[in-house]
């Protein structure tokens, strides 16, 4: 994928040495940008090969048919669609749209379908409960089963919600950002500046046209829906058990996390 590249970017360099204090991409050439995309494609191809190897082991050991296999991702990756690289910095489609593939075990059939309707990763647990006929948990987490979508195409009633902390520079504290998607409408909300952007994602899947100035009442409605969802999330969080202690990681793990940009 990237063996053709002869530029200055060092793949093994740490995140902070490459982006010490900003997300500016002005110094990157078109060749650099193509190389970054190709390196990401290499990562995807490597992950695909590892998944294939795992499935081959399950198959050769006669365990594949009895296995529940779930393929998913925690986030997408940006390549300047909205002026940024990397991930977890904004809440546009390229950051949030990820795959979810479920291979059910032997004895669980009838769920084979491709669901195009947007869903949330919090829907995974209730989907597994329904699909495997497990006792449903009534408290402690959110989400809804996707099984009705398979059988009768029922549309999602609950909005999709996401949050992140935007890092503009490492000299400033992260800025919280929130997103709510209800049907074809999506709002991005910055609590610190109390500012909103809204998009009609059916007509504008690339989220390039902010309609908040043209549709102030729609913006207000979506903002109120987002704030209600935030309040509900916080109330639910109060019911969650206290997290256990985090054990100190060894030096090699800390080095890897720093290289990936998780520590500074």
PLM feature spans:
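Catalytic domains that recognize anionic headgroups
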Residues: 1-264
């Amino acid at each position: 994928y990237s063996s053709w590249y002869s530029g200055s970017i060092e793949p093994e360099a740490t995140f902070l040495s490459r982006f010490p204090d900003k997300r500016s991409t002005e110094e990157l050439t078109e060749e650099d940008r193509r190389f970054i995309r190709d390196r990401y494609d290499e990562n995807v191809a490597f992950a695909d090969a590892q998944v294939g190897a795992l499935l081959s082991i399950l198959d050769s050991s006669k365990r594949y048919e009895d296995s529940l296999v779930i393929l998913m991702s925690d986030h997408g990756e940006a390549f300047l669609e909205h002026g940024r690289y990397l991930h977890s910095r904004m809440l546009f489609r390229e950051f949030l749209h990820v795959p979810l593939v479920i291979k059910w075990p032997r004895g669980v059939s009838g769920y084979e379908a491709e669901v195009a309707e947007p869903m949330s990763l919090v829907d995974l647990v209730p989907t597994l409960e329904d699909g495997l006929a497990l006792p449903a948990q009534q408290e402690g987490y959110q989400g809804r089963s996707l099984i009705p979508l398979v059988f009768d195409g029922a549309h999602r009633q609950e909005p999709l919600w996401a949050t992140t902390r935007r890092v503009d520079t490492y000299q400033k504290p992260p800025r919280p950002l929130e997103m709510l998607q209800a049907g074809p409408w999506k709002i991005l909300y910055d609590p610190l500046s109390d500012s909103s952007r809204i998009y009609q994602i059916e007509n504008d899947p690339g989220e390039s046209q902010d309609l908040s100035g043209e549709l102030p009442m729609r913006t207000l409605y979506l903002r109120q829906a987002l704030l209600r969802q935030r309040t509900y999330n916080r109330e639910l969080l109060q019911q969650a058990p206290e997290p256990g202690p985090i054990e100190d990681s060894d030096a090699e793990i800390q080095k890897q996390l720093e290289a990936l940009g998780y520590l500074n």
